[in-house]
Amino acid sequence: MKKEMIVYSVSDSLGGTSQKLLSAVTAQYPDIIFNNSYRFPFINKEEELLDILRDAIKDDALVISTLVDGKLASVAREFSQAHGLSYLDLMHPFFEIIKEKTGTDPIEVPGTLHRLDSEYFNKISAIEFAVKYDDGKAPQGFLDSDIVLLGVSRTSKTPLSIYLANKGYKVSNLPLIPEVPLPQVLEKVDSRRLIGLVCEPEKLAKIRSHRLDSLGLTQETSYTDLEKIYQELDYSKTVFKKYGAQIINMSDKSIEETAFLIEEHLKKLN
């Protein structure tokens, strides 16, 4: 039977930082169930914070804090030490190191990571762009794209487009289907901005089969036929070569890893 650990996440903002760290840590413990349903964002009152910490003691929970307010963080730390509560402060030890190195204090303003600045609105615009020019719906958008993703069905074009859009990049994508002519505008796109996505045929067949299963479609079709998939991938590689696209094999890469490679590629263009 797997062990279970209850985790409280406390923040004076959204608390996204602790969630990202927790996801990375929990992945290293497949035999432990982490109950992370106890999330407490926008905490700004001392008594409210203490009530949460008292409940954490009752649940024998681990408390992860991203409180930036120095007074609240001190209250939480002192309470936890006095009551033997497992408490992890993700912010203030980092602040102390920076102050030691630079002599500079943090501004201690919650939510500055999520402020509505030009970067935020650029990201929203990029997401709208990715949706508008998804799946080759409007090929003229290729000319305004930071990146154009090319690939056969189920090579992660759409999720990769949205992921990169969340980083502010304008991304469009085009599904490659041997029977469907390529849009002429593709010839006008800077080849350095073309990324061709491929996947090992056997893995792609499994991904497609899983997709059909999720839709309640179990009948064998050419969509999952291995020979047909080989033909599609051969066709896609011909297209990549013709237009000078950089090729990335998605077989053993996550969306995040692939996005990193694309970002590194983009940096070389600027």
Swiss-Prot record:
Q: Which reaction does it catalyse?
A: N(tele)-phospho-L-histidyl/L-threonyl-[pyruvate, phosphate dikinase] + ADP = N(tele)-phospho-L-histidyl/O-phospho-L-threonyl-[pyruvate, phosphate dikinase] + AMP + H(+); N(tele)-phospho-L-histidyl/O-phospho-L-threonyl-[pyruvate, phosphate dikinase] + phosphate + H(+) = N(tele)-phospho-L-histidyl/L-threonyl-[pyruvate, phosphate dikinase] + diphosphate
Q: Which UniProt keywords apply?
A: Kinase, Nucleotide-binding, Serine/threonine-protein kinase, Transferase
Does Nucleotide-binding show up as a keyword for this record? yes
Q: Which GO terms describe its molecular function?
A: ADP binding; ATP binding; phosphotransferase activity, phosphate group as acceptor; protein serine/threonine kinase activity
Top EC group? transferase
Q: What is its EC number?
A: 2.7.11.32, 2.7.4.27
Residues bound to ADP are: 151-158
Top-rank taxon? Bacteria
Family designation: Belongs to the pyruvate, phosphate/water dikinase regulatory protein family. PDRP subfamily.
Q: Which HAMAP family match?
A: PDRP (MF_00921)
Summarizing the function annotation, the protein's role is: Bifunctional serine/threonine kinase and phosphorylase involved in the regulation of the pyruvate, phosphate dikinase (PPDK) by catalyzing its phosphorylation/dephosphorylation.
| Official protein name in the record | Putative pyruvate, phosphate dikinase regulatory protein
